[in-house]
Every structure is written in C-alpha cells, then in structure tokens.
Amino acid sequence: MNIYEETKFIMKKYNVHANKKLGQNFLFDEQALDTIANEVTLEDTIIEIGPGLGTLTAILLQKAKKVIAVELDPKMVEIISERFKMYDNIEIINEDILKLNINKLAPKAKVVANLPYYITTSIVTELIKANITDITILIQKEVAERICAKPGDKKAGAITYFVNYYADAEIVTNVSKDSFIPAPEVESSIVRIKKLPEPRIKVKNEELLFKLIKENFTKRRKTITNSLSQSIPKNKLLEILSELGLPESTRGEELSLEIFAKIADLC
C-alpha cells in the first residue's frame, strides 16, 4: 500500500474528510515527506504542528528521539492517538499552537509542519520569537517566496524583513498541488528557516523597527513620507531622509533592513 492508498484508507476507516475551516490538505507525496523530514536525527525532539492523519508523524517517529504532535482538530487527535498507541516517543497535544508557550513544550526542539495557508505568517512569527532554531514548513508557494525574498525585492513584505532580521530562510523545493488530498488551489513549497545566533543587525528598538516596517507595507505603494506618517512627524522624517541621503520620493518597499534600522535609530 503506497502513501496515497494509505491516506484514502485511513480517511475511509475513520470516516473523515479534510476540514476546510482548518485549512486541512493531506500530503501523500513520498518525496516531499522525506524532504521535510530530511534533517531530523535520533537526537532531535520534534514539534510537529498539525499532524493531521499522521502521515508525516509516522516518518518522524522512526527518525527522531521524540515527537510532540500539536493538533487542533479533536478527530485527528483521536486518529493519531490510535495509530501510534504502541510508540513511547510521541506526545499528542490537542490545542492551538498559537495558544501554547512553545518554549515550555521542549527546552530544545526543531519544528516540522504542514501549515494551514490562512495562518502561516502568525505561526512563523511566533516560532521565530520562541527559542526554535530550526524550522521546516510546507506552505503556500506565494507565501514561501515572500518569506524567502530579500528585503527590497518586489515580492518582499513585512514578514520578509522580520524573518531576515532573525534568520536565514530558503525554499528547498516546490510541491505540486496534486500531491494533496484534497488538492489545494495553489502550489506549495518546503521552506527551511535557520535562526541566527544573534539578529542580523543591531537596532536600538526592535519593537519600533518592526512597527515601521509593518506600517510601510500596509501602504507599500506610497512614498515613505506618507507610509510612516503615523509614527514619525513629517518634518522629522524629512530630516532623517536627508541625513541618510534618500529622496522624498523613496518608497519603503525599496529599502533594505539596514536602512529601516537606521530610520528607527534616528527617530
């Protein structure tokens, strides 16, 4: 029985369907699953977010010291609890990952996840804030490209700058929408995020830095004198731009992380 057949069998056995509200799509592509689990070792504790039917979980249990499976859907918890009842290296938590203290789940862990598209940015943000140094996620391709873009690129967004400040991120490979049951409307990508020992640059006030970046990308087509007007008085902003040698017509989406940090430091 291949993984596709196994997935269909489990869905039929437990009479379950993917929950659209929870963004469930069950991955059955063996190569993609192996790629996601590729860097897991017997020394690792893995936090798996949204294990679903347990397809990836089964692989992780063979490779990791321990798997902490965090699943919101009680039906999926029932399924994986029965599937893996003979394993002593799994802990199953029926909860929303965003409501948990991630650092308390394990003192040192890697994260692996097939994330719901609608909540990807929130989860990535919380994982990077936590003491997680290694994150491998399967997410919507468009979001992956935004996360892995370079600050100043056309595809960049606020999440680009946030991730780039704390970590290195790369797209490992793309995954066809035909690799899922049911098939989503968009293509997916596997992204690997490695947190840096220290932030990429130094800034006096991180909170202000990310506030300015977020404000800018809510008005990304406007000049920086307009997009940052809520946080910085226009006269002060003009002084800062002059000091940095930037014209008033500059758009924030054109700026590097370093320039945003300098603006924040000069406020």
Q: What residue spans do the PLM features occupy?
A:
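Catalytic cores of RNA-modifying enzymes
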Residues: 1-214, 242, 253, 257
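C-terminal lobe and adjacent flexible extensions of AdoMet/dcAdoMet transferase-like proteins
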Residues: 215-267
